């Protein structure tokens, strides 16, 4: 790509929203200048947009799953479709993510290695960068069969973790699914504190962040004490746990939308009146915990569990962000949860618009302050210095 200058009417730098125009200059995949106002940059191609941000991040997705299929029987049959079908779905999902302004996606597990394969395919292209957790780890006979390998004790669990040399994160299935009517997690934690500590220590030896599928106070308490890097889902948190997470640096990916979709579409999951009532209580508590997490400084990573029933890739992240807004989180914090916070949590460069930062950007027609829905469709993205433009985007002009 030639040197590119992007002129934006307003912008988010990764921490704060700016209401004044800016010109961002990109050369050799790096931001080389940030100028106040709209200026012509000799020798560059130029693009004018309404709003510029670091590229959005989907912190929890399953790329091989088709979130656009709502029929549960068809979804079950799809699980037997095989590798080529899974790859084809994943490729479409990456394009959907890009169209939604997402330039980095963390795939949180599949047992067929589709996430690793897509990571390789997307590398060096204008598609979103794939961060892959590979195959997760679960207790034998417990929840997680479609994305996790079974282990039987602390020794085999730690040994399993040590094989994850090609994974970007190590995912551990700490608890099961939720009983909607009871508004509680089904069953106890899959691993004890000692077992989980052995696994997090093994991951630390590899230099890999850890991710735990975890809900319920008992499981989250163990996960936080054992040093898990981020809690995925995290239903039934409380103020004391959120404070410990804030103090210890444990992040939280709330994945609001899958549960909200079931509440709003109970017939699709054969959920009765008791279940709907339970879902309401669960989501009320989740909303309160979002507010409490923000107040205490717990790191929030925006992630939707895209691919789950009712959660479309791309749209899912924006639905989650809308839930944060409905809960009362400030716009700058909402944007940070989907830009700078994940990259910082994972030790990655980027997530900020500043000189010397990687050119990893998303451009939109207008500011989200005029409506968060403005972020649902990008007019352009830049990944590794490679520009992609939506069909409706302004044409490049020689400056």
Residue ranges, per PLM feature:
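N-terminal metal-binding scaffold of metallo-dependent hydrolase/deaminase domains
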Residues: 1-40, 51-52, 366-371, 386-387
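Active-site core of metal-dependent hydrolases
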Residues: 180-288, 296, 301, 306-308, ...
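Metal-associated gating/positioning segment near the N- to mid-region
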Residues: 50-121, 226
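Histidine/acidic-residue-rich, glycine-tolerant segments that coordinate divalent metal ions
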Residues: 109-222, 230
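C-terminal cap of metal-dependent C-N hydrolases
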Residues: 9, 336-340, 355-399
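His/Asp/Glu-enriched, well-ordered alpha-helical/loop segment
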Residues: 205, 270, 284-367
């Amino acid at each position: 790509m030639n040197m590119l200058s992007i002129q934006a009417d307003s912008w988010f730098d990764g921490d704060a929203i700016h209401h004044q125009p800016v010109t961002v200059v990109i050369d050799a995949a790096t931001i080389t200048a940030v100028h106040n106002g709209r200026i012509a940059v000799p020798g560059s191609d130029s693009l004018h947009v309404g709003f510029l941000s670091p590229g959005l991040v989907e912190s929890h997705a399953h790329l091989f799953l088709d979130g656009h299929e709502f029929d549960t029987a068809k979804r079950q049959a799809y699980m037997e479709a095989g590798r080529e079908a899974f790859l084809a779905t994943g490729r479409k999902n990456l394009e959907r993510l890009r169209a939604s302004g997402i330039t980095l996606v963390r795939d949180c597990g599949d047992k067929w290695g589709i996430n690793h394969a897509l990571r390789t395919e997307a590398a060096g292209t204008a598609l979103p960068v794939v961060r892959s957790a590979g195959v997760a780890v679960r207790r034998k006979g417990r929840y997680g069969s479609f994305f996790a390998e079974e282990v039987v004790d602390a020794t085999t669990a730690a040994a399993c973790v040590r094989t994850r040399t090609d994974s970007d994160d190590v995912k551990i299935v700490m608890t099961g699914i939720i009983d909607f009517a009871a508004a509680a997690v089904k069953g106890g934690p899959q691993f004890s504190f000692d077992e989980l500590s052995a696994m997090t220590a093994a991951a630390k030896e590899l230099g890999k962040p850890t991710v735990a599928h975890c809900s319920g106070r008992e499981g989250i308490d163990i996960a936080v004490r054992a040093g898990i890097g981020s809690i995925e889902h995290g239903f039934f948190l409380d103020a004391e746990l959120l404070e410990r997470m804030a103090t210890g640096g444990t992040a939280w990916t709330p994945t609001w939308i899958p549960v909200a979709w079931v509440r709003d579409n109970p017939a699709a999951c054969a959920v009765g009146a008791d279940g709907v009532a339970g879902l309401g209580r669960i989501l009320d508590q989740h909303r309160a915990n979002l507010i409490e997490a923000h107040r205490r400084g717990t790191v929030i990573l925006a992630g939707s569990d895209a691919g789950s029933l009712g959660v479309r890739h791309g749209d899912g992240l924006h639905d989650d962000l809308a839930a944060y807004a409905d809960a009362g989180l400030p716009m700058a914090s909402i944007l940070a949860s989907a830009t700078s916070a994940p990259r910082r949590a994972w030790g990655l460069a980027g997530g900020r618009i500043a000189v010397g930062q990687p050119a990893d950007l998303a451009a939109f027609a207008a500011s989200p302050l005029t409506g968060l829905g403005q972020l649902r469709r990008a007019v352009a993205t830049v990944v590794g210095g490679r520009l992609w433009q939506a069909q409706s985007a302004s044409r490049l002009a020689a400056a």
